[in-house]
């Protein structure tokens, strides 16, 4: 089937899913979760084939080790994927919510109401669990979606989507073609030109992918190109909390776009050596003089430096960061600590500003 027909089918599906009930959407999501659990061994088998093919690409230097790690599905990721779908089913329906009511004049009232976007084009690299996440969110928000995954995970992607659509086929009155998938670079080129049918493009991947998408389409793009994330350990921080926060932010999923890449430590923090030693025990490679402070490692590698005060930390983050996710570890038990926290929260130029305190 050519891409234009896929896009037309998606547009038709978007109009139909916008008209179904919350109960039907939630029933579909629960069915998807059940089917993924039922067929998880087949999904693992498909993923094993992708991993074998990807290993040869790693050996040849065509993909990185971090890309390989994102590709891998295991029992933990499978469990999280299934639970994530069930959690989305439990969420309040985001559609048809009154967001604003304003009386403009006598007998004239303005209502701002949430509604579906329409057709989403999702382009992603390596991570096959993205299919389940995006499909579930699309269903809950009453949108149709066209997925294009990386070639490294093609077998896993096909299997997961096959399971999802098999589950949807069992739900009476659920519209067809809500979740579709394409596979080639030609399909991507067609997707980027298809502003007649596609309402929003969401790229999920590295810097090169996101920039390419933004530069080659007239369709609105929702994407973030870099994940240069920081943690600032203030002078008052609790050492145990600092160790836990930094270790988890680097090791839980090193290739995630919100994994920490740079650690900033107040020069008056009394246990700098203890913190760095604990990180090394967690097999984190520390770099104190990197070639670039704007490098996304995607691995268990962490650049670090000491700073004189919270203002120097903020200046560093705003200069070298990507505005994604940044965190301060401090206390909230004294006036100075609270001033540092509030200043960090106000002045850091980040979409997500995390505050980790002991009260």
Regions found by a protein language model. Name each.
Residues 9, 125-144, 170, 209-301, ...:
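ALDH superfamily catalytic-core signature
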Residues 118, 199, 261, 326, ...:
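Conserved acidic residues
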